[in-house]
Every structure is written in structure tokens, then in C-alpha cells.
Amino acid sequence: MTILVLGINHKTASVALREKVAFSDEKRLLALKQIKQTQLAECAVILSTCNRTEVYLHNKNVGPQNDEVWLDSCVQWFADIHQVDLEELKSCLYSQQNLQASRHLMRVASGLDSLILGEPQILGQVKQAYQMSEEYYSLHSDIGMMSTELSRLFQKTFATAKRVRTETHIGESAVSVAYAACSLARQIFDSLRNLNILLVGAGETIELVSRHLLRHGVNGLAIANRTLSRAEKLVEKLETTQKIDIFSLDRLSEGLKRADIVITSTGSPHVLISRNLIEQAQQMRHYKPMLIVDIAVPRDVEESAGEIESVYHYTVDDLHNIIQHNINQREQASQQAEHIIQQESADFFEWLKVHQFSNLIRNYRESAEIIRQDLLEKALQALQNGENTEQVLQELSHKLTKKLIHQPTQAMQTMVKAGNTEGLQAFSHAVKS
């Protein structure tokens, strides 16, 4: 084993445990320092989000004979750095090695392992985690960089995630209520940039809607809420330079008269926007098209509002139908994505095997050259001291043969004990040739 991932996510662990094992930026740097100082691994990348914490490690000195011991050491370190109970952690922890580890990372970065299938934010989080490790090892590694193996894995992963986005429709359809509401608005109106949009409420859903709209360059945004202070706090959280009008619900009729789009999500037990209120607004607007998206449960908008001329009225049930359709599309796209990931992870694993054996061959040749030079130097010294030439050459050839076949002989003995018939057959063919 050279590459290992171990972690927990939203499918294996509770929110409480996920919070305990989360890495802040400061703790992440401490972890990388510990991993280097204890020689737990050559290098590591730590991914920590609200839904998962994963550590990707590379150790070139770990093989089949000691991989379980190394895994146990990594799990113990994981528990120790977060000061959590080892058995509690083990019950929620998953681990993958080499080929499966590379496949897991590619699935994560492509959004196939996310709470919301195909969500795009995770790729940016994986890139950020990689960049933090890259910066750390550029300053603190003996070779001034991350290991070739782990770096290659992440670069391959980024290319794979891009391929998944390009060749499938995994991220094209809205699968959250807030995003679906904004997508619906973009479908009905060619551009949102110069429209007046009224958001009613100041909760989490309206916050998500606000962020989606601001990303699409909306200029005329207004928020109406029962308490102005909560609306003001929402605007502060958005951290935008865009001017956002704020007013209380008693001025709702004024806001409706200016609104091209109304998206509402409050906790009110009663209807806030009556058909009559919308009718009055439409008269003032000369019946220009108005989109109303009512995300609230119970409803904020009177059910018959959609009967008014030029009013497009959608409820949360309509959005859920859209979302379910989109989820089905994403699931179909995920099958294509899995095929791409299977190809790319297999390609990486083939490279990894070739790279490992290239290092093995190079190291063996370097070792043989050191042995040759050492024995030659001793033989030349013996000749200079007047020793018998034939005896010196006999001793040189004997020692050279003995030293050169020592490591291969040990390897064969290990293969015999392990019952590795394929390895022995390959070695036998090589010797015969």
C-alpha cells in the first residue's frame, strides 16, 4: 500500500462526531507537521467540510507485510489529534487503499459522494485542501514539494472531475428548493439583471436564494420581513456591495407594485399575500408579467393568485416535482460519471504501479553499483598490496555474486512463504531467459 484514505462523512457519522473531527486551518497545519515529524506518512492532504473529514496519506515504505500496522497507526493518530474515543471513531470510519482510494477521491471531487448528488462546491474544497498541503510541503519537505504519487493523484482527480462536468449533465439541473426557484426565474425571464426581485422572509432559504441571485448579477433586489433587524443581519451575511432595499411587511403592497419576481418563504401560519393585493399591484404595473414562487409551508400566497392575468404562480410542490425530475436526470448522469471514474482511476493505478517498480529497479541498480564500486576498490587495493591476482579475482567474483543475489533470494523466500506462485513463476521465467 502506498496511498491511503481514511475518513468519516454524512453517511457514516452523526453531526456531533463530524464536528469533533473537523480540521480548522490551524489544526490542519498542526496535523501536517505531526505526520511529518512522526514519519506516519511521506505527505498528506486533509479535506474537511461540514459533511466530511478525510485524510489522504502517501507512504512509499508500506507494503503488504506491514499495511495493517500502518493503518492502525493512522487511525490511532486520527483519534488522538481530535481527542475522540478510538472505538467510537472506528465505528464510523472508512478506509480505502491505492486503486480504491483513487476512485473514492475522484467520486468525491465529482460530487458523486455528496449529500446533494452532483453539487459543484466540493471540487473547490478539494482543490483548496490540496493547495494548502502543496504550500506546506514546498516549505517543509526535504525535497521542497509534495510526493510525486500524491500530487499525481490529485492532478488526475481534477482532470477527471472536469471531464465528468463536461461529458455528463451531472450538475446542470437544480436539486434544491432555493436553486430551483432561481432556475425557474431564469427560465421565464431571459435575464434577471435588470428586473426588480422581492424576497419575502429572511431565513435560511431566502439567504440561499439571495446568494444564487447575486451570483447571476441581479441589481434590483429587495427584502421584506416582519422584523427589520433580521433582514439587516441577512444583508450583512451576504457581504455584497450591491444595494439591497429592506422594508417591513406593512409596506408589502408597495414592494409588490415594483416587483417582477416575488420569492417568498416565511414561517407565517396565515396567508401574507392575498389575491386582492396582487391584483392591485398588477393594475399599477399594467399587467406586466409577474413570477411568484411560494416556497413557504403553509403557503404565503393565496392559492388563486395564479388566475390573475400575466401572473405565473408556483408553489413548493411545483418545485419538488421539478427537483425530483432533475434528481432522476442526475442519477442517470451519475452512471456515465461512474464509468469515467472507473477508467481514470484504473489509468492512475497503472501509472502508480509502473512508477513504483521504476523506483524499485532504479534503487536496486544503484545498490548494485555501490556494491560493485566497494568490492572493486577493495580488490584494487589488494592487488596494490601484492596479493595473488587470481585469488583476488576469485574473491571479488564470489563476494559480488553473493551480495547481488542476497536481496532477490530474500524476496523469493518471502514469496514462497506467502504462497505467491505468480511472482515465483515470473521470477523463474526471468532467470531462465
UniProtKB/Swiss-Prot annotation:
<keyword id="KW-0521">NADP</keyword>
<dbReference type="GO" id="GO:0050661">
    <property type="term" value="F:NADP binding"/>
</dbReference>
<comment type="similarity">
    <text>Belongs to the glutamyl-tRNA reductase family.</text>
</comment>
<comment type="pathway">
    <text>Porphyrin-containing compound metabolism; protoporphyrin-IX biosynthesis; 5-aminolevulinate from L-glutamyl-tRNA(Glu): step 1/2.</text>
</comment>
<keyword id="KW-0560">Oxidoreductase</keyword>
<dbReference type="GO" id="GO:0008883">
    <property type="term" value="F:glutamyl-tRNA reductase activity"/>
</dbReference>
<dbReference type="InterPro" id="IPR015895">
    <property type="entry name" value="4pyrrol_synth_GluRdtase_N"/>
</dbReference>
<dbReference type="InterPro" id="IPR036343">
    <property type="entry name" value="GluRdtase_N_sf"/>
</dbReference>
<dbReference type="Pfam" id="PF01488">
    <property type="entry name" value="Shikimate_DH"/>
</dbReference>
<dbReference type="GO" id="GO:0019353">
    <property type="term" value="P:protoporphyrinogen IX biosynthetic process from glutamate"/>
</dbReference>
<feature type="binding site">
    <location>
        <begin position="119"/>
        <end position="121"/>
    </location>
    <ligand>
        <name>substrate</name>
    </ligand>
</feature>
<dbReference type="InterPro" id="IPR000343">
    <property type="entry name" value="4pyrrol_synth_GluRdtase"/>
</dbReference>
<feature type="active site" description="Nucleophile">
    <location>
        <position position="50"/>
    </location>
</feature>
<comment type="function">
    <text>Catalyzes the NADPH-dependent reduction of glutamyl-tRNA(Glu) to glutamate 1-semialdehyde (GSA).</text>
</comment>
<feature type="binding site">
    <location>
        <position position="114"/>
    </location>
    <ligand>
        <name>substrate</name>
    </ligand>
</feature>
<keyword id="KW-0627">Porphyrin biosynthesis</keyword>
<dbReference type="Pfam" id="PF05201">
    <property type="entry name" value="GlutR_N"/>
</dbReference>
<feature type="binding site">
    <location>
        <begin position="49"/>
        <end position="52"/>
    </location>
    <ligand>
        <name>substrate</name>
    </ligand>
</feature>
<dbReference type="InterPro" id="IPR036453">
    <property type="entry name" value="GluRdtase_dimer_dom_sf"/>
</dbReference>
<feature type="binding site">
    <location>
        <begin position="201"/>
        <end position="206"/>
    </location>
    <ligand>
        <name>NADP(+)</name>
    </ligand>
</feature>
<dbReference type="InterPro" id="IPR015896">
    <property type="entry name" value="4pyrrol_synth_GluRdtase_dimer"/>
</dbReference>
<dbReference type="Pfam" id="PF00745">
    <property type="entry name" value="GlutR_dimer"/>
</dbReference>
<dbReference type="InterPro" id="IPR006151">
    <property type="entry name" value="Shikm_DH/Glu-tRNA_Rdtase"/>
</dbReference>
<dbReference type="InterPro" id="IPR036291">
    <property type="entry name" value="NAD(P)-bd_dom_sf"/>
</dbReference>
<protein>
    <recommendedName>
        <fullName>Glutamyl-tRNA reductase</fullName>
        <ecNumber>1.2.1.70</ecNumber>
    </recommendedName>
</protein>
<comment type="subunit">
    <text>Homodimer.</text>
</comment>
<feature type="binding site">
    <location>
        <position position="125"/>
    </location>
    <ligand>
        <name>substrate</name>
    </ligand>
</feature>
<feature type="site" description="Important for activity">
    <location>
        <position position="104"/>
    </location>
</feature>
<dbReference type="InterPro" id="IPR018214">
    <property type="entry name" value="GluRdtase_CS"/>
</dbReference>
